[in-house]
Amino acid sequence: MGGFLPKAEGPGSQLQKLLPSFLVREQDWDQHLDKLHMLQQKRILESPLLRASKENDLSVLRQLLLDCTCDVRQRGALGETALHIAALYDNLEAALVLMEAAPELVFEPTTCEAFAGQTALHIAVVNQNVNLVRALLTRRASVSARATGTAFRHSPRNLIYFGEHPLSFAACVNSEEIVRLLIEHGADIRAQDSLGNTVLHILILQPNKTFACQMYNLLLSYDGHGDHLQPLDLVPNHQGLTPFKLAGVEGNTVMFQHLMQKRRHIQWTYGPLTSILYDLTEIDSWGEELSFLELVVSSDKREARQILEQTPVKELVSFKWNKYGRPYFCILAALYLLYMICFTTCCVYRPLKFRGGNRTHSRDITILQQKLLQEAYETREDIIRLVGELVSIVGAVIILLLEIPDIFRVGASRYFGKTILGGPFHVIIITYASLVLVTMVMRLTNTNGEVVPMSFALVLGWCSVMYFTRGFQMLGPFTIMIQKMIFGDLMRFCWLMAVVILGFASAFYIIFQTEDPTSLGQFYDYPMALFTTFELFLTVIDAPANYDVDLPFMFSIVNFAFTIIATLLMLNLFIAMMGDTHWRVAQERDELWRAQVVATTVMLERKLPRCLWPRSGICGCEFGLGDRWFLRVENHNDQNPLRVLRYVEVFKNSDKEDDQEHPSEKQPSGAESGTLARASLALPTSSLSRTASQSSSHRGWEILRQNTLGHLNLGLNLSEGDGEEVYHF
């Protein structure tokens, strides 16, 4: 029953250790697990004790336990004991025999790295073997044991994430009885795993949303926190996320709605009107360092943006944007536009003087040059320009002071990489401000070449104006579309274009290398050949030709191939790629614009003084509701569903009358609801006696009937009806 002997390392394994990790990849995780499980089965077949535990062979098991040569604590390929094997295969009788013979097995964890820390209690809980769980707890199995192996971590390569404690395992498999048993035996509902996640956090991440909501309520019922402890649902993990915020980041709309139902207070019901108070704790971004709204819009999951359509988030964002966000954003856009006009004017009228001395080269066409600092501010016009330059410099400093703190707060990768948060525009505006300061330094030090940073600053500064289009529903999604095309389609296309241009430019250069450059010199110099090929690729110029001389024969062949590949194939491919990107973004343009509005609102709320942006909602202190803030929403529900049913009966009777008047016309049968929902919209053509007005009237009734019955069959809840919401503060 001894362990495996270590294998001798051959030349291959030694070479693998010496080679860099990027040359020799580690073994795939799935293959590694497959190998471990195959070794486990092999080890079970080789060990009589493990095999008897697997097969629940009690007679053999008792004989082995009486044999003094049998090591009851022997382990399998995964570092598991015989009790782990019995629990894995739900063999209660074998587990009881093993615990009677060796009670210490109850506390033994698995030693394999992938499953480290897993006890028999973890396995029994996952398999929902209630009797075995009771037996283990009776023998004082540890309810605080932690399964810390790599197979239990929150990772894309793992199919499940149940946390580390037996209680979280029981909650994730939705075993209410086992959860109660563990809590009664001292399981800590506030226990956190290595990520800081409590059992509530882990429930948010489970795929079965309905069971997760039920278990969430059960666990909260055991939260008997004292005055010195915060509520269980407000305990953050290591990322600072509470279960509520984690639901927003993950886009778990079911859990979000469930939690909001627990936070709402119905004030009154007046016929179809219902007044509801929603608790804005953790929702309102006012004064929050880790804003819920910012977390939602910056989430990598598209489902997270659906949270923005849920009550009361939708109403809160709408109020903030319409009352504060839109006016301040328009003012900010106007100020930036005036600022760019000022900077552009200063650049246009920069101090220049006539160049002294004679030109030394025939291709030199420069007639003006930059003035020295001592000569640049002498006239009245220079003083006016100086004021504009000071405004430009102060504006650049303000931009840097506003942008740099957010980089450290959010993180560079997230701040510059999230399109919804502004992403590339932050890079552009920071680069612009830096170039303005570089231009100032060059002006003060009399350094020639200020035109370089100045020209780049003008381009970047005016490109930043596109950032303010996010305040308009028609233009906002187009900025995202442009960004996706530039960083997606264009980047991929540039790699292909570079390969094609490099290959054909080299060919053109070789062809014209022996020719007279005075007759056709576009390809004589290699850099010029690259530039000419680039222009030909984009069809900026036509193919160079000189009909007074004989061109090389290979030029026609290579140019023909280049025209087919570049103009007909690759450019049209690029257009098709951009068209596909446009279609994909257009499908979610409204959703993207709402996310842009939320991100802009949070940005303005964070940067503006509190006196300019008061807190939204109703303070509960004034009405005996504590120190929390609330949002009042009025729902209007249609409480007369029988009216819709009467419309359906009218449509059915109308169909019967049409059948009697026109027996030759075949109408769809109303026996099945699916057939009613797919009522035919085709006009009857067999009868020619119907007038045009009758046909038009019949078409209108058909459309109205199809829409009404379609809504019914699509799951319209007649007990609630359609409702609209009005929010108040």
UniProtKB/Swiss-Prot annotation:
GO terms for molecular function: calcium channel activity; calmodulin binding; metal ion binding. It is found in: Apical cell membrane. Glycans are attached at N358. Residues 654-675 are annotated as: Disordered. Keywords: ANK repeat, Calcium, Calcium channel, Calcium transport, Calmodulin-binding, Cell membrane, Glycoprotein, Ion channel, Ion transport, Membrane, Metal-binding, Phosphoprotein, Repeat, Transmembrane, Transmembrane helix, Transport. Residues 349-385, 443-448 are extracellular. Gene3D superfamilies: Ankyrin repeat-containing domain. The modification Phosphoserine is found at S689. Residues 654-665 have a biased composition (Basic and acidic residues). Pfam families: Ank, Ank_2, Ion_trans. Expressed at high levels in kidney, small intestine and pancreas, and at lower levels in testis, prostate, placenta, brain, colon and rectum. The modification Phosphothreonine is found at T685. It is a multi-pass membrane protein. Activated by WNK3. Glycosylated. Its main location: membrane. NCBIfam families: trp. Homotetramer and probably heterotetramer with TRPV6. Interacts with TRPV6. Interacts with S100A10 and probably with the ANAX2-S100A10 heterotetramer. The interaction with S100A10 is required for the trafficking to the plasma membrane. Interacts with calmodulin. Interacts with BSPRY, which results in its inactivation. This is Transient receptor potential cation channel subfamily V member 5. It comes from Homo sapiens (Human).
